[in-house]
Structures are given as C-alpha cells and as structure tokens.
C-alpha cells in the first residue's frame, strides 16, 4: 500500500498499477460500475487523472488486513486525495483482495467508493 501511495504521489500511474494483477480477470468496481481487466483499469485511471494536479496526494488510512489463508488477504480502509481548491479533495473507502501470485502479491479485486 505504501508503494502505491509513493507511485501515485510521484504522478506515476504505471508504477501504481504494478500492484494490480495484470490479467483480464482483474475486477475493479468504482463509481462507474464494474470493470474487468488490467488494461481497462489503467485506461480509466489515465482518463480520470490526466495531470499530477488532478492526481493530488494520495493517503491510505485505517488499513485493516484480514487473512483468508496464507496466500489471500482482504484489505479494507479509507483513501483520500488532497488536491488544490480549484479541483477539490476526494475521499472514500476501499476493499481489496490481495492474492500471492508467482509475480508477488497482487490486487485481484478492488471495490472503491
């Protein structure tokens, strides 16, 4: 989660997306509904946050990690984006399913509101 914060706050969506499972079966649920696939998810991020100013400063809080087994965790918490007054701040909550893959720990399911 700290890697994601750092990548986001450096304006690097590509690095931010490295924690997501690069697969068509990735599920991302957000304000626009359910999206499937890593390609669709990164495209949506890049369309929504075209500049570093729009990205703002990301902070994750109240992170709770619940193990399902040795290779699966459910992570919940609050996210916030601090941005300048002309754009406005954003915040919400998330639930992530992290699964240990051959390439390391990856987010396979993201429900962000």
What are these regions (language model features)?
Residues 91-113:
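Short beta-strand edge/turn micro-motifs at domain boundaries
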Residues 33-35, 81-82, 113:
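Solvent-exposed loop/turn segments at secondary-structure junctions
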Residues 13-67:
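A solvent-exposed, acidic/Ser-Thr-rich amphipathic alpha-helical stretch
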Residues 71-79:
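A short hydrophobic beta-strand element
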Residues 53, 81-89:
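Short, cysteine-centered beta-strand-loop-beta hairpins and adjacent loop/turn segments enriched
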Residues 45-46, 61-66, 79-81, 93-99:
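Hydrophobic/aromatic beta-strand elements that line small-molecule binding cavities or substrate pockets
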Residues 1-12:
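Short, aromatic-enriched amphipathic alpha-helices that serve as compact interaction elements
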